[in-house]
Amino acid sequence: GVIGLGAIGVLVANAASELGMEVFGCDPYLSIQNAVRLSHHITIVKDNDEIYNQCDYITIHVPALDSTKGMLNKRTFDQMKDGVKILNFARDILVNDADMADALANGKVSRYVTDFPNPAVVNMPGALVLPHLGASTEESEENCAVMAVNQIMDYLENGNIENSVNYPSCSLGYRKKTARICVCHYNRPNVISQLTSLFGEAGVNISDMVSKSRGEYAYAMFDVE
């Protein structure tokens, strides 16, 4: 079971499916872009409880938010199969360490694999703790810095968004000689139709446009003449 079908979660789900596993995935904010990349062999379920109830292996790939802090805890462990294996390479605070220690001790969880070592986790019987590398090397830090600068420049010069925390990835490519208008808005019905009506009333022609949404936020780009 894969909880969180973002860029990494989709890759994990597809890889597990290619290994011959029956894969369940859950993500209430699954983007169209990631849905297209997801193998058709993956079963999408409506909530995490279905994964807790059915899966022998559970891996989490969600951000650290108030709503996800300690999401794996005694209540959710009690829903899982006996002997479940859990993988956490996302964020350390997603797992309640004390409840995980109890679940490992009583056999509810047979193995906990993570790359977030701390004194509690490294002393848990049944925990397989790996080094957390991330962007710790000099080369990766430099690459991350260059990538961040390029993405900020692309937004400032062209209005394109990539790898935003709250907004969807959205691009119209390089800005042409025409003007480009970018609108950040809540993901509500009829916003795009209202915007295009305003352009029409002002006698502005739309030569190209794109609109993407992610959760409660959306982003629209218009090339106008």
Show which residues each predicted segment covers:
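Rossmann-like adenosine-cofactor binding region
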Residues: 30-121, 136
